């Protein structure tokens, strides 16, 4: 029998990383287009998801940003940071929502709270009511 597997090796790749997702934005669900109250965006549910991922050994969790009703990413991450011990918190931040000097200070403070376990995802998306070209956004 022929082996059809393709082995990929890299000196810089230790293995695949599987991260998790914190349901900060209302409407996030295990299925697209369905709203399930078990996955609502509140402190109890969302912090439980994050702390469970931390306890189970996940190395990273995404705290998304959205224009939907939900929790603020940086505020939530700051509140849950002292409760974690191992997991990196990947905070998504949309350009234009926060004044850059204030964002810098907030990120620096959060990085101290997490003792270097902060990851940032800067999203260059449109703001509500605008429709810039990709070239202008990037």
Give residue ranges: language-model regions.
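Aromatic/His-enriched, Gly/Pro-containing loop or helix-boundary segments
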Residues: 90-103
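Active-site loop-helix segments enriched in His/Asp/Glu that coordinate
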Residues: 71, 88, 107-108
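Hydrophobic residues within beta-strands of alpha/beta enzymes
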Residues: 61, 89, 118-120
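N-terminal beta1-alpha1-beta2 module of alpha/beta enzyme domains
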Residues: 2-84
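Conserved catalytic cysteine-centered active-site region
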Residues: 84-90
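Flexible, glycine-rich active-site loops centered on histidine and acidic residues
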Residues: 7-39, 100-138
């Amino acid at each position: 029998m022929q082996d059809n597997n393709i082995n990929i090796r890299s000196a810089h790749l230790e293995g695949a990383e599987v991260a998790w997702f914190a349901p900060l934005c209302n409407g996030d669900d295990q299925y697209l287009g369905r709203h399930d109250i078990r996955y609502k965006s509140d402190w109890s549910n969302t912090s439980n998801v994050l702390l469970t991922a931390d306890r189970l050994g996940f190395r990273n969790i995404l705290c998304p940003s959205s224009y939907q009703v939900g929790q603020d990413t940086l505020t939530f991450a700051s509140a849950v940071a002292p409760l974690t011990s191992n997991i990196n918190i990947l905070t998504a931040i949309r350009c234009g929502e926060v004044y850059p000097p204030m964002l810098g200070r907030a990120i620096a403070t959060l990085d101290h709270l997490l003792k270097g376990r902060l990851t940032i995802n800067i999203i260059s998306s449109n703001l509500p009511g605008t429709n810039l070209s990709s070239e202008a956004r990037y």
